[in-house]
């Protein structure tokens, strides 16, 4: 007869032994930043045999840029002036769905792209030619207000909550040591053979050779729209215009090329000119914030969207 309990203990001991050997023998890697780039890097490195620790400054992974977005998986429709970007999008989607397919939302969401009748950098004719040249599928749709062309396309969104769960599960599955509420300093590097910095807007804080970037403080309003917009994602192009995407079950998140930006600067670090807005940054959805550009979003949306 087989002693299952004894075999189970042997298996557990073997796993613990492997983990102990891994910690002593394999190179130690520190990944700083718990967004999608950091968690993916940590998982892949641990999978490759490295002994990986991930530091996240906040109390959970995926709370900053990875979770404050339009949640759209771009297939390239958004980039008619860059075929290279389209190809990068198509390749990126394949990789994303291989790694995080369970977070992708298909459902009954309808995706639309529209070319504005004014101030668009691309004409309707050129946009259609671009789609045909790149092999991007589309169906012509009745143009929405203020547009010369509206098409329906086959795109997808991702659920940020599901992505967070899946990222955590993957890291746990390959033995990544996740340390939350950890402010990382250069002194922490001494304990590791390699360091991966994946802190997005804070890249330069831990680097000696700093690079200049353009930083933007951006607002993404979360709103409840009329029922006619339920399960609809709309992007107005190609200029300083509006977009809206479903968020959770009955809400939408808004974007605007111009009005979403509260401040911008080029330099080594981001500069938040309005100090009163600091408490809003990377702090989830804030109900009725005192500082907001929502009225400008509404005015811009009324040009294209009925009952907005």
Q: Where are the regions that the model predicts?
A:
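Helical element adjacent to the flavin cofactor pocket in flavoenzyme catalytic cores
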Residues: 151-184, 194, 198-204
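Short beta-strand to alpha-helix junction loop
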Residues: 80, 115-124, 149-169, 288-293
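Glycine-rich FAD pyrophosphate-binding loop
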Residues: 47-66
């Amino acid at each position: 007869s087989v002693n299952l309990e004894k075999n189970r203990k042997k298996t557990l001991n073997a796993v613990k032994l492997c983990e102990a050997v891994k910690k002593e023998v394999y190179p130690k890697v520190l990944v700083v930043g718990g967004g999608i780039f950091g968690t993916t890097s940590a998982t892949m490195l641990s999978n490759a045999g490295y002994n990986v620790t991930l530091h996240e400054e906040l109390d959970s992974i995926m709370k900053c840029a990875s979770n404050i977005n339009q949640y759209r998986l771009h297939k390239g429709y958004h980039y008619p002036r860059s075929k290279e970007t389209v190809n990068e999008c198509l390749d990126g989607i394949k990789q994303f769905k291989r790694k995080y397919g369970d977070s992708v939302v298909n459902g009954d969401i309808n995706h639309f792209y529209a070319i504005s009748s004014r101030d668009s950098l691309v004409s309707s004719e050129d946009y259609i030619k671009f789609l045909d040249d790149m092999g991007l599928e589309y169906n012509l749709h009745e143009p929405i207000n203020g547009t010369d062309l509206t098409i329906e396309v086959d795109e997808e969104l991702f659920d940020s909550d599901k992505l967070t769960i899946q990222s955590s599960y993957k890291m746990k599955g390959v033995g990544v040591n996740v340390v939350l509420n950890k402010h990382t300093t250069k002194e922490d590097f001494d304990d590791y053979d390699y360091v991966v910095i994946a802190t997005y807007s804070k890249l330069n804080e831990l680097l000696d050779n700093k690079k200049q970037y353009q930083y933007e403080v951006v607002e993404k309003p979360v709103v409840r729209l009329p029922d006619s917009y339920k399960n609809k994602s709309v992007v107005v192009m190609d200029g300083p215009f509006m977009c809206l995407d479903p968020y959770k079950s009955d809400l939408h998140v808004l974007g605007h090329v111009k009005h979403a930006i509260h401040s911008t600067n080029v330099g080594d670090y981001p500069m938040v000119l309005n100090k009163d807005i600091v408490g809003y940054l990377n702090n989830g959805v804030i109900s009725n914030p005192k500082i907001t550009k929502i009225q400008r979003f509404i005015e811009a949306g009324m040009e294209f969207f009925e009952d907005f």
